[in-house]
Amino acid sequence: MYPPALTLLLTPGLVAAAIQPQAYASSADGRYKLSSYSAPVRGTGTPGSNSTWKLTIDDTPSGRKQTIKGFGAAVTDSTVSVFNALPSAQRTALLNTLMTTAGANFAMMRHTIASSDLSANPAYSYDDSNGQTDLSLSNFNLGGRGNAMASLLAEMRRLQPGLTILGSPWSPPGWMKLNRAIQGTTVNNNLDHAYASQFAQYFVKYLQAYQAKGATIDAITIQNEPLNSRAQMPTMYIYADEAGDLIQNNIGPALRNAGLDTKIWAYDHNTDQPSYPSTVLSRAGGYVPAVAWHCYASSLDWSVLTTFHNAHPGVEQYMTECWTSAKQPTPWNWAASFTMGPLQNWASGVTAWVLGTDTNDGPHLTGSDACDKCTGLVTVDAAAGTYNLRGDYYMMAQFSKFMKKGAVVMSGTGSWTYGDGSGLESVAATNADDGSRVVVIENKFGNEIYVTVEAKSGEVWSGLVYRNSVVTWVLPAAGA
């Protein structure tokens, strides 16, 4: 069966000045790590004895899809602590590698509002108030860990001025909940609506505190994984209609009245419950411009995002969490796949879980529910004063380094995965600044594939794609 064609659009009028075709690769065998690779050539080239694969790109206005906002990962307390444990020179080098064009050029970060499972003990919020009710939130305080988080995010924003920061809480202060606990029980693990106003003001105070430290937050979700209730980590259950009403009646107005333009994204959970964000939009659509998805559905299907887009074409979508692990190894292309799939289905950005951990996948809370196998894109050996960029980092950088913020994803066909997991997946975009066209190709075969890309404008590009690798082609503007 011959795979369908990939389509791509170039925005008219953009001129790519002296852009030469380039290619970069990251491979399963570690031979390539965001490394320069044989560039594609004009024409059909010479495939020799290599297997071939044909893609087509439609570089006309009909192919325009979503605009890229950025790629990155979750900044947790673990990330902050291990990055800050590095010697100054190493820390500076790492942040430049992550946040600038010298490295991954990450332009989106999701951070944890107070404690998550990837926090050292004890779990905390920004207004614990010794467990006592604090109606005026007079005891609100970022504390040492919150201040350290805000400082790191501010530093990231200075390095990447176009950075989009999303904040997500794992739990509000325990006194706001029916069970009066951040963690420890799943009984009555819900918001006490007697404190709905304080819940909304908690977000206001958090946003103002971070803004004062130079870490302006662009968007929030009101609860990480609102359908996940666990005893041994911070969680809180929020029903879909409840979430919509809280946003419409409390949180949205509170942010507006405080003069904050922070956006509220719906859901922040798995793709198997698309009715949840639909319900939120029906009840609070005026405050909700975007939906956030996670990758943990038992039967993961990113086409859910396309179906959702067709029902809600004006709503942005993001893939905001998918774990990476070394202790429970995921496939070599795991991070590439959880970036590729959402992009093919209308996602404007992707963030992995998690940006940084130590070499033991922590620090993390104790208890069976906390993730003790979540490994950062970066691991830090504090004793040695060194860091390691893991394979998942390179897989995500194959997208983030070349598909710049503002790039437009193009409609396409041509991607195909067989039942045994082999195949070739691709997504393409046009950069807004120079008109360069970026085609990311994920080769899931154990052999090299000679790929030919035919453009509707008349161009043909071809080149070899390394086995079990992700290769990014950077092509000049059409007609250049």
Swiss-Prot record:
<dbReference type="InterPro" id="IPR033453">
    <property type="entry name" value="Glyco_hydro_30_TIM-barrel"/>
</dbReference>
<dbReference type="Pfam" id="PF02055">
    <property type="entry name" value="Glyco_hydro_30"/>
</dbReference>
<dbReference type="InterPro" id="IPR013780">
    <property type="entry name" value="Glyco_hydro_b"/>
</dbReference>
<dbReference type="InterPro" id="IPR017853">
    <property type="entry name" value="Glycoside_hydrolase_SF"/>
</dbReference>
<comment type="function">
    <text>Partially degrades N.crassa cell wall beta-D-glucan, liberating small amounts of oligosaccharides.</text>
</comment>
<comment type="similarity">
    <text>Belongs to the glycosyl hydrolase 30 family.</text>
</comment>
<dbReference type="GO" id="GO:0016020">
    <property type="term" value="C:membrane"/>
</dbReference>
<feature type="signal peptide">
    <location>
        <begin position="1"/>
        <end position="17"/>
    </location>
</feature>
<feature type="glycosylation site" description="N-linked (GlcNAc...) asparagine">
    <location>
        <position position="50"/>
    </location>
</feature>
<keyword id="KW-0732">Signal</keyword>
<dbReference type="GO" id="GO:0006680">
    <property type="term" value="P:glucosylceramide catabolic process"/>
</dbReference>
<keyword id="KW-0964">Secreted</keyword>
<feature type="active site" description="Nucleophile">
    <location>
        <position position="321"/>
    </location>
</feature>
<keyword id="KW-0326">Glycosidase</keyword>
<protein>
    <recommendedName>
        <fullName>Endo-1,6-beta-D-glucanase</fullName>
        <ecNumber>3.2.1.75</ecNumber>
    </recommendedName>
</protein>
<dbReference type="GO" id="GO:0005576">
    <property type="term" value="C:extracellular region"/>
</dbReference>
<dbReference type="GO" id="GO:0004348">
    <property type="term" value="F:glucosylceramidase activity"/>
</dbReference>
<feature type="active site" description="Proton donor">
    <location>
        <position position="225"/>
    </location>
</feature>
<keyword id="KW-0325">Glycoprotein</keyword>
<dbReference type="GO" id="GO:0046557">
    <property type="term" value="F:glucan endo-1,6-beta-glucosidase activity"/>
</dbReference>
<keyword id="KW-0378">Hydrolase</keyword>
<dbReference type="InterPro" id="IPR001139">
    <property type="entry name" value="Glyco_hydro_30"/>
</dbReference>
